[in-house]
Amino acid sequence: MNNKTTMLIDADVLAYQSAFTAQANIQWDEELWTVHTDLALAKTWIVDRLETFKKRLKADDFILAISDKNNFRRKLFPDYKANRRSKFAPIGLDPIRAWMAEEYGTVIYPNLEADDVLAILATERPNRSDKRIIVSIDKDFKGVPCTFYDFNRGELHEITEEEADAYHLMQTIAGDSVDGFKGVSGIGQVKAKRLLDTNGASWETVLKAYSDAGMTEEEALTNAWMAYLIRKDEYNHKHKKLKYLWMPKEFTTAQKRKYSHIIHGVTGELDEDLTRPDPF
């Protein structure tokens, strides 16, 4: 029996955190300030983190995932993560990404975020003999049936498929201000979870929350697509594209066909205008 443990690491987070750690403001005189990054410091920080993760999780190997410059979610919702576009990215970010790719190798799937890549690799686990652990700080991974290590909090989570599906529905109702999509007005995560616990973790509960707020089924579906991380059966590795988008299990064939034009828009070739915006 193969007892190998592989860490699936969110390299986007490592790149950002190391770049901010290595960045410094320098005052040369009363009116002259500059910003610089010590790439050697950033590289050392990443190496130390990887060793810490390996010891903490008793891991044998790791895979680093990076987000593609294109993102299928922007075709569905152009304002997805738009709130991040005006933020100043650390100046060493691109060189650090390039160094990780050269030093360790990084995995990028066309049109997907690093989170999607990790979710796909994690949900392949039933067909593999190794144990896989997602390593990140992103609570969105509670919406994936997986083992998830939140390294900011030092917490290890074993998430069942039932728990993951319920978390996804909760995010659909509550929205995610960090990712820039709003859910039902006046309903946060606590209230959304209470609704699902009381009325059942179903699409019917989600739709009623939207309907009561004067919102449409399509708005609910769009938010569900924003919140959902792609799993193994939904991505075509050979052709490097999405096979299909998540749909409520309660949907009939006729209901699915109603949204087929939207689905076909993102399961084909994606437009170049979905490129990740320049951070400056």
Feature annotation, model-predicted:
Residues M1-A98:
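Domain-level signal for Mg2+-assisted phosphodiester chemistry and nucleotide/NA-binding surfaces
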Residues N2, W33, A59, N83-F280:
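Extended two-metal-dependent nuclease catalytic cores across DNA- and RNA-processing enzymes
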